[in-house]
Amino acid sequence: MARLVLGLVSCTFFLAVSGLYSSSDDVIELTPSNFNREVIQSDGLWLVEFYAPWCGHCQRLTPEWKKAATALKDVVKVGAVNADKHQSLGGQYGVQGFPTIKIFGANKNKPEDYQGGRTGEAIVDAALSALRQLVKDRLGGRSGGYSSGKQGRGDSSSKKDVVELTDDTFDKNVLDSEDVWMVEFYAPWCGHCKNLEPEWAAAATEVKEQTKGKVKLAAVDATVNQVLASRYGIKGFPTIKIFQKGESPVDYDGGRTRSDIVSRALDLFSDNAPPPELLEIINEDIAKKTCEEHQLCVVAVLPHILDTGAAGRNSYLEVLLKLADKYKKKMWGWLWTEAGAQYELENALGIGGFGYPAMAAINARKMKFALLKGSFSEQGINEFLRELSFGRGSTAPVGGGSFPTITPREPWDGKDGELPVEDDIDLSDVELDDLEKDEL
């Protein structure tokens, strides 16, 4: 009996840590290796749940998700991604909390967020509504844009962000560039090249957006541009090479799906990108621009300069710079100010109740923030940021529901603070003898 109980506990634990769904369910388990093939290249409608096995809300959703999958079988595809295990997929679609449900309709590159109820009935209703809309769009001749990946190389709209290179343009664009280049050498008749083309095109667009053009994807017809093919020893198709300034080209040996290519490109970007700027909040433009142009902006409120001196403040800034470099792949914004300088910002974020220094991370798009409640140390901040990167941690709405007003101020001059100089009082007219008599 004890062995039976232990076995049941072990099985339960295994299921809890490995995933919430099994092959016997009607829910299709999705991973980086099959997501593009199953979802992106599909003509049908998909509902995809991004979950974490440890998430209580996900566990409560599981039976309802299975119920919906069974009801929608052969009508609408219902899938699930263990985003705790496959973080690249979660990051690719901006998943910040669990569970997150997305509807992949006509335009698979721009899924819609599902905001409905968490019951099987509500999920089925939403799926059928989305399916009706998909059919109406098709009747109206709207395809939803590039999604199926079936266009050929002749369709320039599907590969607008892939740079076509030739023997004449290669050196100027690639070798003389400070950017990182991933170059595909292909042959028009090559079947593997045709299969790669839609993945390469979709990846090019996403990489351009996420790296702001610092990593570029290109293509060379090696049957026409034989000088390049000979120079780089191209003997099979497709061959992908990575070019970085001042280094010899290296072969790309990763997967051939969009997510694989994007993941490698982001790694290259992270390796070559300088650390993010750590900016002092001295006006509204700096604060709003930093927060609105990044998925998250990390705001540190340091003690007043009179409390720490220049040495103390610089030690805090060094910690922040170190962590900004560590998390630069996330492409967050980084800001700092001193206690009391931005009262409305502190008030909107609930900062100050735990003393200084303090920290918050703001999502300006959703007007929500998370507050550091651990120690303001490298280890404490790292744990806080790590939880954020996994979509964990509690959040709250920004006070007032909008970005707080920023008070313009002069930037810190890098020096120790000075106490205000008191005005000298002229005592020459004071009759001390008269004061003594009056006191008596």
UniProtKB/Swiss-Prot annotation:
Q: Which SUPFAM superfamilies does the annotation name?
A: Thioredoxin-like
Cited function: May function as a chaperone that inhibits aggregation of misfolded proteins. Negatively regulates the unfolded protein response (UPR) through binding to UPR sensors such as ERN1, which in turn inactivates ERN1 signaling. May also regulate the UPR via the EIF2AK3 UPR sensor. Plays a role in platelet aggregation and activation by agonists such as convulxin, collagen and thrombin.
> Single GO molecular-function term?
protein disulfide isomerase activity
Source organism (scientific name): Mus musculus
According to UniProt, the name of this protein is: Protein disulfide-isomerase A6
Q: Which residues carry this modification: Phosphoserine?
A: 129, 156, 158, 428
Q: Gene3D superfamilies, per this entry?
A: Glutaredoxin (3.40.30.10)
Which gene produces this protein?
Pdia6
Among the Pfam families in the record, one is: Thioredoxin
